[in-house]
């Protein structure tokens, strides 16, 4: 508002303000929002030891990939064995006269099994990548939390981005600040 004069200020408002139903959430100035974020981050800093313990246990138990890696290796071995069976069936068909209907039936089964293994391999790979990505995000959160000063005054943009996942303003004038470790802090306007 007042974009070209000395009274300029940034106001945050709901993105659904002009839809069919008018949104009842309050407008916030940059200063109000920053104050509530600093307050929430101070509460997080005060409870740092507990948050670090919880987040590290989550990181190791939920985002661990060793069991998935073992299963992925087994699926890779099964894929190689299944590919060899397919190649053997093709070579046998080329060198030995046999009933083609029976051969086609056998090839369908072998191919279906191979495709199922490929799908499982793909699913495991995606799950491992997702867990690794979430683990890396949690590691960044933990590093940034350890760097957070005892008294939070004015956090920089990188700290805000790494620590905060989402900020929700409700119609009852409460602000829910969700940190990347799942912790939520509720502030009042």
Describe the residue ranges of each PLM region.
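Amphipathic alpha-helical coiled-coil/heptad-repeat segments
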Residues: 1-189
């Amino acid at each position: 508002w007042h974009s070209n004069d000395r009274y300029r200020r940034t106001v945050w408002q709901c993105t659904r303000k002009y839809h069919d139903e008018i949104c009842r959430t309050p407008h916030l100035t940059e200063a109000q929002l920053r104050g509530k974020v600093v307050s929430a981050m101070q509460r997080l800093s005060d409870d740092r030891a507990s948050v670090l313990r919880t987040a590290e246990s989550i990181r190791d138990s939920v985002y661990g990939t060793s069991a998935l890696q073992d299963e992925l290796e087994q699926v890779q071995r099964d894929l190689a064995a299944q590919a060899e069976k397919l190649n053997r069936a093709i070579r046998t068909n080329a060198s030995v006269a046999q009933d083609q209907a029976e051969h086609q039936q056998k090839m369908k089964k072998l191919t279906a099994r191979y495709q199922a293994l490929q799908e499982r391999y793909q699913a495991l790979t995606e799950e491992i990548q997702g867990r690794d990505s979430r683990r890396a995000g949690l590691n960044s959160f933990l590093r940034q939390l350890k760097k957070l000063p005892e008294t939070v005054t004015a956090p920089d943009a990188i700290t805000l981005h790494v620590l905060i996942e989402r900020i929700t303003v409700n119609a009852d004038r409460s602000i829910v600040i969700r940190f990347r470790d799942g912790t939520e802090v509720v502030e009042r306007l």
